[in-house]
Amino acid sequence: ITLDHPPLNSVSKRMMVEMMRALDEFEQNDVVRAIMVKANGPDFSYGADGGDVKKGINGEAEEISESFSVLGNRLVERIDCCPKPTLVAAKGRCIGGSTAMFNAFDIRIVGEGFRMHDGDIYYGTVGSWGMSSLRLPMWIGRNKVLDYMFLNEDFTGRQCYELGLASEVVADELVEVVGLATAKKMSKA
């Protein structure tokens, strides 16, 4: 699966629905033994598509934002509970809701230039997909999350690896190659 929503690979409602359809297809296909997700362009994803979140400012924005959040949570849960092994090969920036999506994969290969940043922390909002407030403390511990939140810093690819948020760090130009090789290994396991 390739994220391809230029210029920033923003996560739109359409992208989420298409990803869930692809996951459904792959799960039903006995030939598919592992599922890999990558992104077109220099960055994995800049998170939620502002246009999808803000549509209908005149009274319906809250409802649309809520439905966007519900769909995002469903996608993250869908990836996390996929019965087939999943892998993400990511480089560049990974911001906001895409951090929750990224961390839902079983295996996470990142480039040396990878940067993960929770946009909700920057804007002072509660993470709609549960990344900073729910999932991250379970994985890296409360104190590290507080550092991340209060200092508003990115996690580098190396830090993600050291904290267990990434399975492997490779040169940016090798992310997809290593991801594909790893997916092939996964499909034989």
What is the predicted function of each stretch?
Residues 18, 38-78, 94, 124:
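Glycine- (often His-adjacent) and acidic-residue-rich active-site loop
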Residues 106-107, 147, 151-153, 159, ...:
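Well-ordered beta-strand positions
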